[in-house]
Amino acid sequence: MTAGTVLLLAGALGTDAFSLCLGLGLNGFRRRMAWMLVGLIVALHVVLPVAGWYAGEFTGRLVGRWAAYLGAAILFYLGVKMVRESLAEGRTATGKLERAGFLGLTVLAGSVSMDALSVGFTLGTAGAALLLTAGVIGLVAGLMSAAAFVLAHRVEDWVGRRAELLGGLVLIGVGLRLLF
């Protein structure tokens, strides 16, 4: 997998976190809680691809090239899912979630990081460089999340939806690239 592909993939994975953080930031999420959430997003965007990578590497040895097809199908599915969700009406984030504390933030971070587990599986089947790729995914997701909080007071609500739509289209493209 090329560096450009890894960056595109990392950006696509970071769009869910960006959208969440933008929505929370627009609703007055406190700075301390915002930085805790960003840290959790970074951690999960590094750990989950590593876990998925090991599962994908094992599967790649077990079933060979078919594992790459499965990985491409997973990326394609995730991309379509993200596009559909970005077009759905009535999705909102709320700053009231702060009351849930650290556990609530962990659940929020996990909700936007689970796609990274599936992507890690795909990386394992493709034989991608594990630590570098997971680090890039975590760094990009963290930067996108932090940027969303910083920019939240300057942007309109429509940006979050379009970011998720773009991320879904990128995942579809990466999935198709793995097939061909």
UniProtKB/Swiss-Prot annotation:
The chain crosses the membrane at residues 6-26, 33-53, 63-83, 101-121, 130-150. Its main location: membrane. The keyword Cell membrane applies. Keywords: Cell membrane, Ion transport, Manganese, Membrane, Transmembrane, Transmembrane helix, Transport. It comes from the Bacteria. It is a multi-pass membrane protein. InterPro entries: Mntp/YtaF, Put_MntP. One of its GO terms (molecular function) is manganese ion transmembrane transporter activity. GO terms for cellular component: plasma membrane. The keyword Iron-sulfur does not apply. It is found in: Cell membrane. Belongs to the MntP (TC 9.B.29) family. HAMAP family: MntP_pump. Probably functions as a manganese efflux pump. This is Putative manganese efflux pump MntP. It comes from Desulforudis audaxviator (strain MP104C).
